[in-house]
Amino acid sequence: SLGVNARTVAVCGFLVTAILSVATGTSWGTFAACAPIFLWLNHILGGSILLTTASIAGGACFGDNIGLISDTTVVSSGIQKVEVLERVKSQVVWSVACLVVSAIIIYGMSIAMQLPTEVANTAIAIDSIPTEAWSAIEAQKPAAVELLNQVKEGVPFYMVIPLLLVIIAAVLGMPTLLCLFLGICSSFILGSFAGTVESLGSFLGLVESGFSEAGSWVIVMMMWFGAFGGIMSKMNAFEPLSKFILKISRNVRQLMFWNGLLCIGGNAALSDEMAQIVTIGPITKELVDKNVEGSEEDIYKLRLRNATFSSALGVFGSQLIPWHVYIGFYVGILSSVYPLHTFIATDIIKYNVMAFVTVGSLLLLTLTGWDRFIPNFGLPREPKVKLKNQTSDVNSDKEICA
């Protein structure tokens, strides 16, 4: 209702998809729902199609990295044996900082491109979507059609309250299930007033389908992790790789940095962020558990970082890999809903500010130790944590001197 112009459509799309992805816990569904709106709105306004496309792609990944009901968040936390809520609390400041920095850069790029400043609104953009695009959206993500209709008709601003309640409850340290319960109850109450909820039965049906869609994937991946991890452990299949990483790591911080690069490498090799999480996750966990000495609290913080590596470098790292299934899905959706442009993988990659900021900052902060300036995000410093081979070397030197 406020209207956007060509200079703000990309950053607005970025922020809207980021918020929506946290609420839904899915980047794919968020992208499928928002791409038609912002691509056609961008078309009407005369904005940059590539910047807008990459911005909504990056924003849609935000919830998959920090959402309480995101499958990548849940699975990566489970593999590292950390609580989802603790995981989110440890990285929320860094994640939001990446969001803010990316939004500023995207808006700066829009200004640098000298884009027009005429104003339009989303209702006009939705009316401009051709019939063929509607059919493609319904085939890929049927729920996105309902969301588009709600956006066209208008949804009251107070419907953001359930999302805010979930975030506040999580920050206060409430259990994950209680956070979700608050969000579900408030959504039903406010949705009844807003007209987005028809009845209790239909609402419970939506909740059930949402949990079953997300939960089924989590269960399958955790079963795969259990079977795959057990077999690989008995075969010592990861031992050569683990020994190599230990050999080139001079301290714990370097070990964690290489864990991050290992996640990116696994993501590129497997072309699937979930496959990377369940394949590389056990390796990074074992590297920390078997080779780092420290208090239980400090080791737990290292596991939290490993979990962040798995999902953040899995989801956002996928945005920088041309052959990744994420990019393939995005290109397929884009080609269906906006046939006026021929999209290729590099279109999404080169303008995806959020992906570059998130991946780059996570690795840089880990390696340099600058993560200590971010609340709850800093890794324990030496001598609180040490590599076990360093401890053995020190003990050997003491014995020789004696």
Model-derived features: where do they sit?
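Hydrophobic core segments of alpha-helical transmembrane domains in multi-pass membrane transport
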Residues: 13-21, 96-110, 158-172, 181-191, ...
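Inter-helical loop and helix-membrane interface segments of multi-pass membrane transporters/permeases
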Residues: 1-8, 46-52, 113-153, 194-209, ...
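Hydrophobic alpha-helical transmembrane segments of multi-pass integral membrane proteins
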Residues: 5-37, 245-287, 310-311
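Juxtamembrane and boundary regions of transmembrane helices in multi-pass small-molecule transporters
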Residues: 65-68, 77-143, 276, 317-402
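Hydrophobic transmembrane alpha-helices of multi-pass solute/ion transporters
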Residues: 1-8, 144-155, 160-227, 240-244, ...
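Juxtamembrane helix-boundary/capping and inter-helix hinge elements in multi-pass membrane proteins
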Residues: 46-50, 75-88, 234-237, 249-251, ...
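Alpha-helical transmembrane segments of multi-pass membrane proteins
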Residues: 7-19, 46-62, 254-267, 293-323, ...
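Short helix-coil transition sites and intra-membrane helix breaks within transmembrane domains
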Residues: 20-33, 61-70, 216-218, 229-240, ...
